[in-house]
């Protein structure tokens, strides 16, 4: 979104008090409880500083449509010890996601914050476990023809031809109840023998 609630870390009490220091503690507490019961946790990485506080508790991460093209987020992904999904652009552009995967797969050197809080030069090894998330653009892109087209782009970029589909956002026309319709289509693609979709992203309140 252009403006709006940025999440638990940024504004933990949803009252525009922006008590980020408390949000970081709450986020770690929630993630530790989730990990304690043996459930893997995922998170979207909005900025490049907060991951230092939570990345050890994250099993999978996402880079949003508006930040997939950001060089600093690609560098961040190159150093994270978890699979990272890059969403296609808000206009439906897949190439920015394939470019991001290629960039994140390579080593990088950049300024960041060390675990002790000091500004440091960071060297990453590259993250080969990155993938595309289809989230729709000017129109939904979850149907088989769009999945096939995206996988063809991945193959052309010499990347694995498999991806994740976001049931929400532009794929549901921002109507949460339409996620069921999208999920039904994805299930039929898999039932018909497609191996191109390995997972889905669902928006809900658990």
For each feature predicted by the language model, list its residue ranges.
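Redox- and metal-dependent alpha/beta enzyme cores, enriched for Fe-S-associated oxidoreductases
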Residues: 150-158
């Amino acid at each position: 979104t252009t403006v709006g609630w940025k999440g638990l870390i940024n504004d933990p009490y949803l009252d525009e008090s922006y008590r980020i220091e408390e949000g970081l503690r709450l986020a770690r507490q929630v993630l530790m409880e989730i990990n304690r019961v043996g459930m893997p946790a995922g998170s979207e990485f909005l900025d490049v500083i907060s991951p230092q506080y939570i990345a050890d508790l994250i099993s999978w991460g996402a880079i949003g449509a508006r930040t997939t093209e950001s060089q600093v987020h690609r560098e961040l992904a190159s150093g994270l010890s978890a699979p990272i999904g890059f969403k296609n652009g808000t206009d439906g552009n897949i190439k920015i996601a394939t470019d991001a995967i290629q960039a994140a797969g390579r080593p990088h050197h950049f300024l960041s914050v060390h675990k002790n809080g000091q500004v440091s030069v960071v060297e990453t090894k590259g993250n080969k476990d990155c993938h595309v998330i289809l989230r729709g653009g000017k129109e939904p892109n979850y149907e088989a023809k769009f999945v096939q087209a995206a996988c063809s782009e991945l193959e052309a970029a010499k990347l694995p031809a498999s991806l994740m589909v976001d049931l929400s956002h532009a794929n549901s026309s921002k109507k949460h109840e339409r996620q069921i319709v999208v999920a039904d289509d994805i299930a039929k693609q898999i039932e018909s023998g497609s191996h191109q979709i390995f997972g889905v992203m669902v928006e809900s309140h658990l």
